[in-house]
Amino acid sequence: MPFACLAEASHCCTVALPGGEKAVLRRFFQRPKRSMAALLTRQRMDCKGDGRFLYASRPFQILRFEIRPEVLFAAQWSDQSQGLEIAFEDCWIHGLGAMQNAIRFECTALLVPKEECVEAQARAMVLLSSDSPLTALPTGLRQRLAAQALQLVFVRLERRCQGGLKRALLDWIAEDAMGRADLNRES
């Protein structure tokens, strides 16, 4: 069954990390499991090995639907893009009844360590099956609902970057600084 794009959007944010050296931040992101544990709720994440993870998102409301996304994604360090690449491999959107197989969600993200910050970029799409009963709804309404869903996703991503990821990175920076201070005392 062919799918058509209802909405596509991207979002960028910068996580300020005073004292964060690029090399130190890079070491953090070179271990995808550590990075994903900082970004996502650990109790909802299942590590599948080889940089693949299954994540059951917290439910959210759109209209009368309680939507519960579940995502299988891969995360890996890329020397070419100098960052952690995250790509959805599969996504299940529970809570839409018979319509849940008619909707697809795709997302890619890149977390790039810089001097004293991390730049996060995400691109996402909502797609609808051409034989879905939802095609009977006006196009404008379908597109607005899909755009609203993407904005909710980006709000969550921003909050996770500025919250858990930032805390984990600041702890990582502090641990690295203490380790270097201990080495200097021993010299």
Regions found by a protein language model. Give the residues of each.
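Solvent-exposed residues in well-ordered beta-strands and their adjoining turns
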Residues: T14-P18, R58-F60, Q76-S78, V112-K114, ...
